[in-house]
């Protein structure tokens, strides 16, 4: 304690001596010390201010990221809702087309519509950002449509073949009936004995024309 008091006295004595010999030197030293302290305080205040501004900027960035994320979620939900409505509509249309197919009433226009549905879903799968469950649902829908389209095409071709066969058989029956009227008692498939080659050729041409 005594040493500290002695040091203070010594400092005061030095300051007093300097004040007598160099007026203003002590005041300048004290001013410099105050300025140094003020600068230190100013630096700390600036540092705190910079940190606060940085924190505000980070918070604003977080808010912006949150807004973008929420916007993506809303957009994705709307897309899911729209896709769900479209799929329900398509399934309803496919049920009608399937009923027409079973009844043999599927038209060319309906077949084209099925093909269009396949193409639309293929393009949609490329353009949408789908998760695994959505991709699986879309693939199942495409498979269902393709099965209906293939089945419808087979039915249409089968109906066309049956119609051609029926027309051919009707024409054949007409020719046989004509021959029976002209040549009573003739065995089916045989020409009469006294028929000339020219007449036989004429009959064959007539039969070919009726087939066509």
UniProtKB/Swiss-Prot annotation:
Principal location listed in the UniProt entry: nucleus
Pfam family membership, one: RRT14
InterPro entries hit by this protein: Rrt14
An example Gene Ontology CC term for this record: nucleolus
Cellular localisation: Nucleus, Nucleolus
Record's compositionally biased regions (Acidic residues): 195-212
Keywords associated with the record: Nucleus, Transcription, Transcription regulation
Record region (Disordered): 26-49, 152-212
Compositional bias (Basic residues): 157-166
Similarity section: Belongs to the RRT14 family.
Function: Involved in ribosome biogenesis, probably through modulation of rDNA transcription.
Identification of the protein by name: Regulator of rDNA transcription 14
Gene, per the UniProt record: RRT14
